[in-house]
């Protein structure tokens, strides 16, 4: 029997050898890798490990055992119609065995409970006795206190009697003084009343005089107005029509009415009480009284004008709602919009600017309403302290693909990040912070491929310093130029790291000359940019790069509020299958704590967990620290601002408002009914569409791939992304792809079981990718297959007409000599005269010595009959060609 060594034991239990040797040492057993291990030593190690983890022998053994038994049998039961049927009978038994030591412990527990009850009873009796003694003591103290109070009361009554006598004497003296003061006050009051009466009479006389003057003025004005009214009535035109004959007839009727004597008006009789029957009074055929028609003319003449009012307009508004606010019909609003060059429907959403122009055009005053008042109130309710402290710099590593960005950061972190990425290229932003001898630095590693322009731009917005990595043997490349542009647009200082100086053919001076063309001037040339020569593979001068970064950060004097509610930016986000939405947030100010309520763009939630870039759980994160947070309601967009708020309810309201605002603005931009887009929409039906459903692992990759695919669209083939998102491919995605006839693309994600079943049933095209180059190339190939094929004409034969014969059946027959290629019977032809095409058609007959031939080769004579053409002459050339289909590809 072979001996069991320490190394073999470590492999069996799945533990590193170093850790197993340490455990043996802790147990008091000294071993090496090749030493054998006996059964006793293994038992000793096991007992030591159990003690170390807090599990004793007794606690490890089970105290209760439950056995379950299941028995199945078939019972035949007589049914209707004399037939019997089998019934499955299942009997389940359950039996529990309890360890004897456990029963003894339970008995001890019961006995301890009884003893505890007796003890509590004795304690209660003793407490009652003590309470009686204390009660008697309190009664004695109260009795003594009452006697002392009685003595004090007698003494106080005597003092009050003496004081009362003294007060009555003083009161009599005060009464005499008050009587004298009252007499003087009465005299003063009488004088004041006399003066007030005199003033009132003077004011009344003045009012009477003013009223008389006003009455005289009104009487004169009223007489003048009456005279004007009389003159106006004489010259007024009361005719209701413009017709001359109608006016004359109306004047004659008026004169006739004026000549008739006026009758006295009779008093109106009370209305008769209605009776049952057909009529109120009289017979069955009594006609109802019909009132005389009255004139349709108004009693006054006033032009109707629309009331001008203030119109409050939000960021988006429906056409019908705008019409209601202006108190006009929606058709009037649509007419005004059509005059202004925009075509709209009654239920269409228009933006604030368009609505304001329409309202002003119709003469109303516009009030632009701010709909984000709640959002501003929530974001402004913060308790950040006014004190600021220094913070670590946020550094973004940029450069062309394969120039060594991740390798540089890899050497700094002493980790191999590049190996984890597919193809050795960075697919999404990585955020890390490292501790150096001179302080902490936070790094953002951005991809260098052209498809990740948007991600690189986001990195530049959230950074303080940009480190541009340029390979010394490759020089300035397209993505290097883009990185320079992003850094300049963000106003961020740039440090150039010239990498791969250890390779043959490295030319750092050439890199400086190329970068100088883009205003990146080294300090030794009198510029402002620091150049550091490094080798990420060998680790050459990496410390010099860190010193340059820290020196630049000292010049910038970076500060931030450390205490208070945190705010930051979402660097990356994804949907994790086990943890839900996960967002990488770079804290920019304040301190983010576990349990805080965070508002991220259109999403919100409470931070359930926080992890650093190494996957360790942390409880708080200060400025310039990147963390992964869990607990959001959905996947936020990369670049959204993350802010800690006080109230979760208000955060939900703000998130819902932002979602509705995003939806309304999106609808307002989709003006498909505009007049200028009408013909473009009609022509859009002729363009072939390549529908795509895209799913990726992180939000940044979704945006980058979608942007690259849209750029592949041409005038003939258009890439239409019908659906995109973060996370695995679900059954919903597969159903959407089947309904829209789309292909499914998964980038670093896989389809679940239900989705695979739907894909197989619908025979969908599903493709997985881990490198973006392959995805873009294959989609480009698929789009090339959708292009309309190109047809080319290739000449396969040429015949010279030597003689022309007449045939009663065919007509003109050309006797020809084949000079080039082969003449085939079923191919189209052209007739050329003086190298000019005069006819294009097909052959009717091809003969040689009266025999029909399928083809005639070069150097032979033949007779050719041209279908529907008889004007063949000697010297003409007959050209035979075929149409070849050429498959097109996207450039």
From Swiss-Prot:
<dbReference type="Pfam" id="PF04760">
    <property type="entry name" value="IF2_N"/>
</dbReference>
<dbReference type="GO" id="GO:0003924">
    <property type="term" value="F:GTPase activity"/>
</dbReference>
<feature type="region of interest" description="G4">
    <location>
        <begin position="499"/>
        <end position="502"/>
    </location>
</feature>
<feature type="binding site">
    <location>
        <begin position="399"/>
        <end position="406"/>
    </location>
    <ligand>
        <name>GTP</name>
    </ligand>
</feature>
<feature type="region of interest" description="G2">
    <location>
        <begin position="424"/>
        <end position="428"/>
    </location>
</feature>
<dbReference type="InterPro" id="IPR000178">
    <property type="entry name" value="TF_IF2_bacterial-like"/>
</dbReference>
<keyword id="KW-0342">GTP-binding</keyword>
<feature type="region of interest" description="G5">
    <location>
        <begin position="535"/>
        <end position="537"/>
    </location>
</feature>
<dbReference type="InterPro" id="IPR000795">
    <property type="entry name" value="T_Tr_GTP-bd_dom"/>
</dbReference>
<dbReference type="Pfam" id="PF00009">
    <property type="entry name" value="GTP_EFTU"/>
</dbReference>
<dbReference type="Pfam" id="PF11987">
    <property type="entry name" value="IF-2"/>
</dbReference>
<protein>
    <recommendedName>
        <fullName>Translation initiation factor IF-2</fullName>
    </recommendedName>
</protein>
<feature type="region of interest" description="Disordered">
    <location>
        <begin position="50"/>
        <end position="303"/>
    </location>
</feature>
<keyword id="KW-0396">Initiation factor</keyword>
<feature type="binding site">
    <location>
        <begin position="445"/>
        <end position="449"/>
    </location>
    <ligand>
        <name>GTP</name>
    </ligand>
</feature>
<dbReference type="GO" id="GO:0005829">
    <property type="term" value="C:cytosol"/>
</dbReference>
<feature type="domain" description="tr-type G">
    <location>
        <begin position="390"/>
        <end position="559"/>
    </location>
</feature>
<comment type="similarity">
    <text>Belongs to the TRAFAC class translation factor GTPase superfamily. Classic translation factor GTPase family. IF-2 subfamily.</text>
</comment>
<feature type="binding site">
    <location>
        <begin position="499"/>
        <end position="502"/>
    </location>
    <ligand>
        <name>GTP</name>
    </ligand>
</feature>
<dbReference type="InterPro" id="IPR013575">
    <property type="entry name" value="IF2_assoc_dom_bac"/>
</dbReference>
<dbReference type="InterPro" id="IPR027417">
    <property type="entry name" value="P-loop_NTPase"/>
</dbReference>
<feature type="region of interest" description="G3">
    <location>
        <begin position="445"/>
        <end position="448"/>
    </location>
</feature>
<keyword id="KW-0648">Protein biosynthesis</keyword>
<dbReference type="Pfam" id="PF03144">
    <property type="entry name" value="GTP_EFTU_D2"/>
</dbReference>
<dbReference type="GO" id="GO:0097216">
    <property type="term" value="F:guanosine tetraphosphate binding"/>
</dbReference>
<comment type="function">
    <text>One of the essential components for the initiation of protein synthesis. Protects formylmethionyl-tRNA from spontaneous hydrolysis and promotes its binding to the 30S ribosomal subunits. Also involved in the hydrolysis of GTP during the formation of the 70S ribosomal complex.</text>
</comment>
<dbReference type="InterPro" id="IPR004161">
    <property type="entry name" value="EFTu-like_2"/>
</dbReference>
<dbReference type="InterPro" id="IPR015760">
    <property type="entry name" value="TIF_IF2"/>
</dbReference>
<keyword id="KW-0963">Cytoplasm</keyword>
<feature type="compositionally biased region" description="Basic and acidic residues">
    <location>
        <begin position="102"/>
        <end position="237"/>
    </location>
</feature>
<dbReference type="InterPro" id="IPR044145">
    <property type="entry name" value="IF2_II"/>
</dbReference>
<dbReference type="Pfam" id="PF22042">
    <property type="entry name" value="EF-G_D2"/>
</dbReference>
<dbReference type="InterPro" id="IPR006847">
    <property type="entry name" value="IF2_N"/>
</dbReference>
<feature type="region of interest" description="G1">
    <location>
        <begin position="399"/>
        <end position="406"/>
    </location>
</feature>
<dbReference type="Pfam" id="PF08364">
    <property type="entry name" value="IF2_assoc"/>
</dbReference>
<feature type="compositionally biased region" description="Basic and acidic residues">
    <location>
        <begin position="245"/>
        <end position="261"/>
    </location>
</feature>
<dbReference type="GO" id="GO:0003743">
    <property type="term" value="F:translation initiation factor activity"/>
</dbReference>
<keyword id="KW-0547">Nucleotide-binding</keyword>
<dbReference type="InterPro" id="IPR053905">
    <property type="entry name" value="EF-G-like_DII"/>
</dbReference>
<dbReference type="GO" id="GO:0005525">
    <property type="term" value="F:GTP binding"/>
</dbReference>
<dbReference type="InterPro" id="IPR009000">
    <property type="entry name" value="Transl_B-barrel_sf"/>
</dbReference>
<dbReference type="InterPro" id="IPR005225">
    <property type="entry name" value="Small_GTP-bd"/>
</dbReference>
């Amino acid at each position: 029997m072979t001996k069991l060594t320490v190394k073999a034991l470590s492999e069996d239990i799945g533990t590193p050898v170093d850790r197993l040797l340490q455990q043996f040492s802790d147990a008091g057993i000294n071993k090496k890798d090749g030493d054998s291990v006996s059964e006793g030593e293994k038992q000793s190690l096991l007992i030591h490990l159990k003690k170390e983890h807090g599990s004793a022998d007794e606690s490890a053994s089970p105290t209760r055992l439950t056995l379950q038994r299941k028995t199945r049998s078939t019972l035949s039961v007589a049914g209707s119609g004399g037939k019997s049927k089998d019934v499955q009978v299942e009997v389940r038994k359950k039996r529990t065995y309890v360890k004897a030591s456990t029963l003894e412990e339970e008995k001890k527990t019961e006995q301890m409970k009884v003893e505890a009850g007796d003890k509590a009873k004795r304690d209660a009796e003793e407490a009652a006795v003590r309470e009686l003694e204390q009660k008697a003591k309190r009664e004695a103290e109260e009795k003594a206190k009452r006697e002392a109070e009685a003595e004090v009361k007698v003494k106080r009554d005597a003092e009050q009697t003496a004081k009362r006598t003294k007060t009555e004497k003083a009161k009599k003296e005060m009464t005499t003084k008050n009587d004298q003061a009252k007499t003087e006050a009465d005299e003063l009051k009488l004088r004041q009343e006399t003066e007030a009466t005199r003033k009132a009479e003077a004011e009344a006389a003045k009012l009477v005089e003013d009223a008389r003057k006003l009455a005289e003025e009104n009487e004169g004005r009223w007489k003048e107005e009456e005279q004007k009214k009389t003159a106006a009535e004489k010259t007024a035109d009361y005719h209701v029509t413009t017709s001359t004959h109608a006016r004359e007839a109306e004047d004659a009727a008026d004169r006739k009415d004026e000549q008739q004597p006026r009758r006295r008006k009779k008093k109106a009789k009370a209305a008769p009480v209605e009776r049952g029957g057909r009529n109120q009074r009289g017979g069955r055929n009594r006609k109802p009284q019909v009132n005389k028609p009255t004139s349709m003319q108004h009693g006054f003449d006033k032009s109707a004008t629309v009331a001008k009012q203030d119109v409050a307009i939000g960021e988006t508004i429906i056409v019908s709602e705008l019409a209601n606010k202006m108190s006009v019909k929606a058709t009037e609003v649509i007419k005004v919009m059509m005059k202004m060059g925009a075509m709209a429907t009654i239920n269409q959403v228009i933006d604030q600017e368009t609505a304001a122009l329409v309202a002003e055009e119709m003469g109303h005053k516009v009030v632009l309403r701010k709909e984000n008042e709640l959002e501003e109130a929530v974001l402004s309710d913060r308790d950040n302290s006014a004190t600021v402290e220094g913070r670590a710099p946020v550094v973004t590593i940029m450069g062309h693909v394969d120039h060594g960005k991740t390798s540089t950061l890899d050497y700094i972190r002493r980790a191999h990040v590049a190996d984890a990425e597919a193809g050795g290229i960075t697919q999404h932003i990585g955020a890390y912070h490292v501790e150096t001898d001179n302080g902490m630095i936070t790094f953002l590693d951005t991809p260098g491929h052209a498809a990740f322009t948007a991600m690189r731009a986001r990195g530049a917005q959230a950074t303080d310093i940009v480190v541009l990595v340029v390979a010394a043997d490759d020089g300035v490349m397209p993505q290097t130029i883009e990185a320079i542009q992003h850094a300049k647009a963000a106003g961020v200082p740039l440090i150039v790291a010239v990498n791969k100086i250890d390779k043959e053919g490295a030319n750092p001076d050439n890199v400086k000359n190329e970068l100088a063309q883009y205003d990146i001037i080294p300090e030794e040339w009198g510029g402002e940019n620091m150049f550091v020569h490094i080798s990420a593979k060998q680790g050459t001068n990496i410390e010099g790069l860190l010193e340059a970064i820290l020196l630049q950060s000292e010049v910038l004097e970076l500060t931030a509020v450390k205490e208070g509610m945190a705010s930051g930016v979402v660097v990356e986000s994804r949907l994790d299958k086990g943890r839900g939405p996960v967002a990488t947030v770079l804290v920019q100010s304040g301190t983010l704590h576990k349990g805080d309520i965070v508002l991220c763009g259109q999403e919100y939630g409470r931070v359930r967990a926080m992890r650093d870039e190494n996957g360790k759980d942390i409880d708080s994160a200060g400025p310039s620290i990147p963390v992964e947070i869990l607990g959001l309601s959905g996947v936020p967009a990369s670049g959204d601002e993350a802010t800690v708020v006080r109230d979760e309810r208000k955060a939900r309201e703000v998130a819902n408002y932002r979602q509705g605002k995003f939806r309304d603005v999106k609808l307002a931009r989709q003006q498909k009914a505009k007049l200028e887009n009408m013909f473009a929409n009609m022509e859009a039906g002729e363009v072939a569409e390549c529908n795509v459903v895209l799913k990726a692992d992180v939000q940044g990759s979704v945006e980058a791939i979608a942007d690259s695919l849209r750029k592949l669209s041409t005038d003939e083939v258009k890439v239409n992304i019908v659906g995109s998102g973060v996370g695995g491919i679900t059954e919903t995605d597969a159903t959407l792809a089947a309904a829209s006839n789309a292909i499914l693309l998964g980038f670093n994600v896989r389809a679940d079981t239900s989705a695979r079943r739907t894909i197989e049933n619908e025979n969908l095209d599903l493709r997985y990718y881990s490198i973006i180059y392959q995805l873009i190339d294959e989609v480009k190939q698929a789009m090339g297959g959708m292009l309309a094929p190109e047809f080319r004409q290739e000449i396969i034969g040429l015949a010279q007409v030597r003689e022309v014969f007449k045939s009663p059946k065919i007509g003109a027959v050309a006797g020809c000599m084949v000079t080039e290629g082969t003449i085939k019977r079923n191919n189209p032809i052209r007739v050329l005269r003086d190298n000019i095409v005069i006819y294009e058609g097909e052959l009717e007959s091809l003969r040689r010595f009266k025999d029909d031939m399928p083809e005639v080769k070069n150097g032979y004579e033949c007779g050719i009959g041209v279908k529907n053409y008889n004007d063949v002459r000697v010297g003409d050339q007959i050209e035979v060609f075929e149409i070849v289909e050429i498959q097109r590809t996207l450039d």
